Amino acid sequence: MTTWDKCLKKIKKNLSTFEYKTWIKPIHVEQNSNLFTVYCNNEYFKKHIKSKYGNLILSTIQECHGNDLIIEYSNKKFSGEKITEVITAGPQANFFSTTSVEIKDESEDTKVVQEPKISKKSNSKDFSSSQELFGFDEAMLITAKEDEEYSFGLPLKEKYVFDSFVVGDANKIARAAAMQVSINPGKLHNPLFIYGGSGLGKTHLMQAIGNHAREVNPNAKIIYTNSEQFIKDYVNSIRLQDQDEFQRVYRSADILLIDDIQFIAGKEGTAQEFFHTFNALYENGKQIILTSDKYPNEIEGLEERLVSRFGYGLTVSVDMPDLETRIAILLKKAHDLGQKLPNETAAFIAENVRTNVRELEGALNRVLTTSKFNHKDPTIEVAQACLRDVIKIQEKKVKIDNIQKVVADFYRIRVKDLTSNQRSRNIARPRQIAMSLARELTSHSLPEIGNAFGGRDHTTVMHAVKAITKLRQSNTSISDDYELLLDKISR
């Protein structure tokens, strides 16, 4: 057993399985008397191993070999190439000692040419703190089977098409823009940036773009992915020394669709790679479509240069659909499932589930499954029984006085201003927003809502709801405020 074999056993005990397999196992250490040469395969590995594991490697070799040694770090594969850095440890060196560093030679990076697919060699199931180099989250596991062929991106799902997307005031602009870029990619709205809360149809629209663009031009190279997969692709290309292939694939797309782009914020390496990918595609007239749960300027940690580029094209929102659209979504979904759903039952479900489309469809499935299991029609009574917990949660969480307090705090006014007769814009607009929220988030009737706002007529509430619905489509500031308030009130 070599000295390095002994060291590996000790190092393995101090690291997670993922760290050991990702960073330590791939390196090769050659010993020549007191000289230990650490071959790190590429510059990324070398820098990360020196900064992250250098002290651990040094102290472990000292423990197994003795203090009088020299450690050399190379950014090459093991084949006797030039050395980049040398660390000399004398008899007094220990784990916490300051080591001397001598730069002997700066090796030129060697490009590795491989086939379009990459062979993954990791079988990791654990993930620890080795994300510092790339900045990816600890929750993102990069797993693969031995010798599994690796391809980039994610498949488009055939069920996500424009015909199955129910259009309403809350999403009609986004849908129209999505259709335009699927027919004429790279001409208008580049990039197309779609934002909105979870479960409101962003992914549906994005994949519908890809599916329709493929119908229009079967030869178009369309790459769909999400930010998590993009990060995994990038990290794996580095681990497998195949960044050229990563760049070739992503930068040769005719249409690039990336879902949940907000998750690259704070991931320095990935963000930089995406920045260059964006520039390459944009300059070549290729279409870029992105989705996020926030408006670009509100994505915390996102580089300013990316925020600026997202503004090159069109930014549109998808909001929670209004009551009529929610009913239409339920009726279409039931029809697609081959089930009959009475209009009044659809209206009941739509009135009581106002969080997002995903939960709306989940409630429908619950009602249809229960009615089928009990050999009953999906009546309002069945829906009431199925959704009683959902309704209780809604009623428990959302009350008009709570809405008034949250809105007043948000706009830094008093609750009594909302119920007063003041008509100044800084009071009237928040009052309209609060009324619209009360209509959307509670089961109170229009007269009840009007009464809670200083005894106003139900027609005033109707006007407020229509005004805010229209403003959310044309005024980004109002739309953003409304979404933030929805989130605050629903917590």
Swiss-Prot record:
Plays an essential role in the initiation and regulation of chromosomal replication. ATP-DnaA binds to the origin of replication (oriC) to initiate formation of the DNA replication initiation complex once per cell cycle. Binds the DnaA box (a 9 base pair repeat at the origin) and separates the double-stranded (ds)DNA. Forms a right-handed helical filament on oriC DNA; dsDNA binds to the exterior of the filament while single-stranded (ss)DNA is stabiized in the filament's interior. ATP binds at G199, G201, K202, T203. This is Chromosomal replication initiator protein DnaA. NCBIfam families: DnaA. The keyword Protein biosynthesis does not apply. It is found in: Cytoplasm. GO terms for cellular component: cytoplasm; plasma membrane. Domain I is involved in oligomerization and binding regulators, domain II is flexibile and of varying length in different bacteria, domain III forms the AAA+ region, while domain IV binds dsDNA. It comes from the Bacteria. The gene is dnaA. Residues 372-491 are annotated as: Domain IV, binds dsDNA. Residues 1-69 are annotated as: Domain I, interacts with DnaA modulators.
